UniProtKB/Swiss-Prot annotation:
Reaction equations catalysed: (9Z,12Z)-octadecadienoyl-CoA + 2 Fe(II)-[cytochrome b5] + O2 + 2 H(+) = (6Z,9Z,12Z)-octadecatrienoyl-CoA + 2 Fe(III)-[cytochrome b5] + 2 H2O; (9Z,12Z,15Z)-octadecatrienoyl-CoA + 2 Fe(II)-[cytochrome b5] + O2 + 2 H(+) = (6Z,9Z,12Z,15Z)-octadecatetraenoyl-CoA + 2 Fe(III)-[cytochrome b5] + 2 H2O; (8Z,11Z,14Z,17Z)-eicosatetraenoyl-CoA + 2 Fe(II)-[cytochrome b5] + O2 + 2 H(+) = (5Z,8Z,11Z,14Z,17Z)-eicosapentaenoyl-CoA + 2 Fe(III)-[cytochrome b5] + 2 H2O; (8Z,11Z,14Z)-eicosatrienoyl-CoA + 2 Fe(II)-[cytochrome b5] + O2 + 2 H(+) = (5Z,8Z,11Z,14Z)-eicosatetraenoyl-CoA + 2 Fe(III)-[cytochrome b5] + 2 H2O
A biological-process GO annotation: lipid metabolic process
Transmembrane segments: 131-151, 158-178, 265-285, 306-326
Annotated metabolic or biological route of this protein: Lipid metabolism; polyunsaturated fatty acid biosynthesis
UniProt keyword annotation of Membrane present: yes
UniProt entry keywords in alphabetical sequence: Electron transport, Endoplasmic reticulum, Fatty acid biosynthesis, Fatty acid metabolism, Lipid biosynthesis, Lipid metabolism, Membrane, Oxidoreductase, Transmembrane, Transmembrane helix, Transport
SUPFAM superfamilies: Cytochrome b5-like heme/steroid binding domain (SSF55856)
Gene: fads2
Protein's UniProt name: Acyl-CoA 6-desaturase
Its membrane topology: Multi-pass membrane protein
Motif (Histidine box-3): 382-386
Length: 444
C-alpha cells in the first residue's frame, strides 16, 4: 500500500475511483521507501519519485505524511506543468470529513495566507524587471574586469593586490546573491532558462555547483531552522545553536569543543573557514560522488579562467594565495549576512507548523536601505523571501507591508532589526546557547 509511487500503484475502489484517506492514514507513510504527501487535498505516493525530483531527494521526504500545499506552491512558478508530473503519483484524496490542514493548523490563517499570495500575484509582485538583473550581472562583470585591468596596469605590489582582492571578493559576493535569484527560478519565465543561467553564474563566475546548492538550499527553505531537515543548522558539532540542542548535548555530556566559548572561537572557525575550507571540499566531493559532470565542467571553467588571468602576473603559488584570500574575505561577508536572519531565531525539531508560522519563527528582516539591499542581495527582506521564494527580490519591499499586516492579524511576531543589531545578535545567541550547554553539562 505504501510502496512504489508509480502509476501502477494507484489504489481505487470497485468503481474505479481513487480511494479516500484520513490524515491518520496519511501520517503513517513517512519512512524512506514509503512516503505520501498531500497537495491541495489530493494524496500522492512519492516513494519512488523522490529519486527523480528536480528539487532534490530529501525535500519531499521532509514533507512525508504532511500537507505540502504551501511548499508546493512556493517552489514551483509553473504549477500547471508540475501538476502533470504529479498525476501519475495520485492515489486518492482526503476524506470529505477531513480538514484541509493537518495537525490542528489554523485554517483561517492558512486561507488568508493563500489569499495574500493571490493578491500579490494580481498586483504583479511575481513579475521580473529584466533590467534589474542585467545591471546586477553587468556590475559583477565590470568588477571582474576592473580587478584584472588593475593588475595589468599597476602591477602586483602589495597595496594594489589588496585592492584587487577586495574588488574580486565583492564580485564573488554579489555573484553569490545573483546565483541565488536564478536558483530560485525568480528571473526568467521558464525553469530551463533559470537553470542554465544559474549554472553559468554559480559555476563559471563562482566555481561552485548548482546541484549542490539546490540540494542544500531548498531543504533550508522547506524546513528552516529545523534539526535533521535544514542542513544550515547542522553545525558538525562545532557549535550548538538555539535553546534545545545545547541542553541535549549538555545532558548527554557531549563536548567536542568548549561550547561555552563558542561565541569567541566563532570568529576563528566560522566566517574565515566556511567557504575556503568546508564548502570548497564539500562542493567537489558532492559533484564527483554524485556524478554531476556538467556542474564540474562549469566549475572547472571558473578555475581555468581565473588562473589564465592571474598566473601570468603572480605565478602559480601567489595566484593560489590570492584566490584563497579572496575566498577568505567572501566567506566573512557570506556568513554574517546569511546567519544574521537565522541563527538568533528559534531552532528546534519539527513542530509541524503552518507555512507562515514556521517561516516567521525562523527568520527576521533587516532595515531597508540602498546599502543594505545591495550588501545583502536583498536578503534583508528574509521574511518575504522565505514566504515567497520565487518573487523577484526587487519586489520584496512591495510584499512586506502586506505580510506584516497578516502577521499582526494573527499575532505572529514579525521581527525587523538594524544591520549592526542583527550581527550582534549572532554572537549573543551563540553565547546564550553556550551557557545553556554548560549549565546542562555541569548540573543535569
Amino acid at each position: 500500500m505504501g510502496g512504489g509511487g508509480q502509476q501502477t500503484d494507484r489504489i481505487t475502489d470497485t468503481n474505479g475511483r481513487f480511494s479516500s484517506y484520513t490524515w491518520e492514514e496519511v501520517q503513517k507513510h513517512t519512512k524512506h521507501g514509503d512516503q505520501w504527501v498531500v497537495v491541495e487535498r489530493k494524496v500522492y505516493n512519492v516513494s519512488q519519485w523522490v529519486k527523480r525530483h528536480p528539487g532534490g531527494l530529501r525535500i519531499l521526504g521532509h514533507y512525508a505524511g504532511e500537507d505540502a500545499t504551501e511548499a508546493f506552491t512556493a517552489f514551483h512558478p509553473n504549477l500547471q506543468l508540475v501538476r502533470k508530473y504529479l498525476k501519475p503519483l495520485l492515489i486518492g484524496e482526503l476524506e470529505a470529513s477531513e480538514p484541509s490542514q493537518d495537525r490542528q493548523k489554523n485554517a483561517a490563517l492558512v486561507e488568508d495566507f493563500r489569499a495574500l499570495r493571490e493578491r500579490l500575484e494580481a498586483e504583479g509582485c511575481f513579475k521580473t524587471q529584466p533590467l534589474f538583473f542585467a545591471l546586477h550581472l553587468g556590475h559583477i562583470l565590470l568588477l571582474e574586469a576592473i580587478a584584472f585591468m588593475m593588475v595589468w596596469y599597476f602591477g602586483t605590489g602589495w597595496i594594489n593586490t589588496l585592492i584587487v582582492a577586495v574588488i574580486l571578493a565583492t564580485a564573488q559576493s554579489q555573484a553569490g546573491w545573483l546565483q541565488h535569484d536564478f536558483g530560485h527560478l525568480s528571473v526568467f519565465k521558464t525553469s530551463g532558462m533559470n537553470h542554465l543561467v544559474h549554472k553559468f553564474v554559480i559555476g563559471h563566475l563562482k566555481g561552485a555547483s548548482a546541484g549542490w546548492w539546490n540540494h542544500r538550499h531548498f531543504q533550508h527553505h522547506a524546513k528552516p531552522n529545523i534539526f535533521k531537515k535544514d542542513p544550515d543548522v547542522n553545525m558538525l558539532n562545532a557549535f550548538v545553536v538555539g535553546n534545545v540542542q545545547p541542553v541535549e548535548y549538555g545532558v548527554k555530556k557531549i563536548k567536542h569543543l568548549p561550547y561555552n566559548h563558542q561565541h569567541k572561537y566563532f570568529f576563528f572557525i566560522g566566517p574565515p573557514l566556511l567557504i575556503p575550507v568546508y564548502f570548497q571540499f564539500q562542493i567537489f566531493h558532492n559533484m564527483i560522488s554524485h556524478g554531476m559532470w556538467v556542474d564540474l565542467l562549469w566549475c572547472i571553467s571558473y578555475y581555468v579562467r581565473y588562473f589564465l588571468c592571474y598566473t601570468q602576473f603572480y605565478g602559480v603559488f601567489w595566484a593560489i594565495i590570492l584566490f584563497n584570500f579572496v575566498r577568505f574575505m567572501e566567506s566573512h561577508w557570506f556568513v554574517w549576512v546569511t546567519q544574521m536572519s537565522h541563527i538568533p531565531m528559534n531552532i528546534d525539531y519539527e513542530k509541524n507548523q503552518d507555512w507562515l508560522s514556521m517561516q516567521l519563527v525562523a527568520t527576521c528582516n533587516i532595515e531597508q536601505s540602498a546599502f543594505n539591499d545591495w550588501f545583502s542581495g536583498h536578503l534583508n527582506f528574509q521574511i518575504e523571501h522565505h514566504l515567497f521564494p520565487t518573487v523577484p527580490r526587487h519586489n520584496y519591499w512591495r510584499a512586506a507591508p502586506r505580510v506584516r499586516a497578516l502577521c499582526e492579524k494573527y499575532g505572529v511576531k514579525y521581527q525587523e532589526k538594524t544591520l549592526y543589531g542583527a550581527f550582534a545578535d549572532i554572537i549573543r545567541s551563540l553565547e546564550k546557547s553556550g551557557e545553556l550547554w554548560l549549565d546542562a553539562y555541569l548540573n543535569k
